Amino acid sequence: MPELPEVETSRRGIEPHLVGATILHAVVRNGRLRWPVSEEIYRLSDVPVLSVRRRAKYLLLELPDGWIIVHLGMSGSLRILSEELPAEKHDHVDLVMSNGKVLRYTDPRRFGAWLWTRTLEGHPVLAHLGPEPLSDAFNADYLQQKCAKKKTAIKPWLMDNKLVVGVGNIYASESLFSAGIHPDRLASSLSREECEQLVKVIKLVLLRSIEQGGTTLKDFLQSDGKPGYFAQELQVYGRKGEPCRICGMPVVGTKHAQRATFYCRQCQK
């Protein structure tokens, strides 16, 4: 599933081609996504794009009278293409732009979303989200407070969007490894120093992934069709049985609640 770095990579890739241009019309080939494509999107005509923002894993396209909310789901990607390039099987939505470009949404599993809203305030998908991990609001004081009485393992707690947004499975595993914290540790057992270190490495890991264009394991592509290259830097995720890059012990791979977890028994306590 595309996580925060992949969505931010998509935002940065599409923004220069959309802002200042006009949506001439939309082409919806298959509106049966996680939620049905909003009727307002079918009717788009000669609408300028004012900004392209991101909140958590949602892309937000600002229009004069409302917003398009895009979620990439499990397998979605957005590409900027020439208008004449024919659509393929899993290309479900196009925004045809006045500059000769097309924003094309591809999603083999159709678990993404294209929604329209007049205002973002109070929208159900955005209303109960925690702070952005790269913001000042996500800091050691905040994490320590939220972990203090939490009797659950730290890894699933990090992946809870009510705590902090966008730290999905890949980056939770990678950040806990970098911080030396076992994924099964109770959140309430973390010391102040461990909270400081964990916040620090989460920010570093996410920023590094954004620099590399995100992580491509299967479906994700950047807006220019290239994969994300952070997969080459993964320390534990997807490396079950391979030697830890620090101590040489085999990386452990387990599953909890249908989520794959990877860690090093030697380096993470």
Swiss-Prot record:
Cofactor(s) in the UniProt record: Zn(2+)
Zinc fingers (FPG-type) by residue: 235-269
Location of the active site: 2-3, 57, 259
Residues the entry annotates as binding DNA: 90, 109, 150
Cofactor note as given: Binds 1 zinc ion per subunit.
E.C. number(s) listed in UniProt: 3.2.2.23, 4.2.99.18
Catalytic activity: Hydrolysis of DNA containing ring-opened 7-methylguanine residues, releasing 2,6-diamino-4-hydroxy-5-(N-methyl)formamidopyrimidine; 2'-deoxyribonucleotide-(2'-deoxyribose 5'-phosphate)-2'-deoxyribonucleotide-DNA = a 3'-end 2'-deoxyribonucleotide-(2,3-dehydro-2,3-deoxyribose 5'-phosphate)-DNA + a 5'-end 5'-phospho-2'-deoxyribonucleoside-DNA + H(+)
Family affiliation: Belongs to the FPG family.
HAMAP family registered for this protein in UniProt: Fapy_DNA_glycosyl
Subunit structure: Monomer.
Name of the featured protein: Formamidopyrimidine-DNA glycosylase
Organism, scientific name: Klebsiella pneumoniae subsp. pneumoniae (strain ATCC 700721 / MGH 78578)
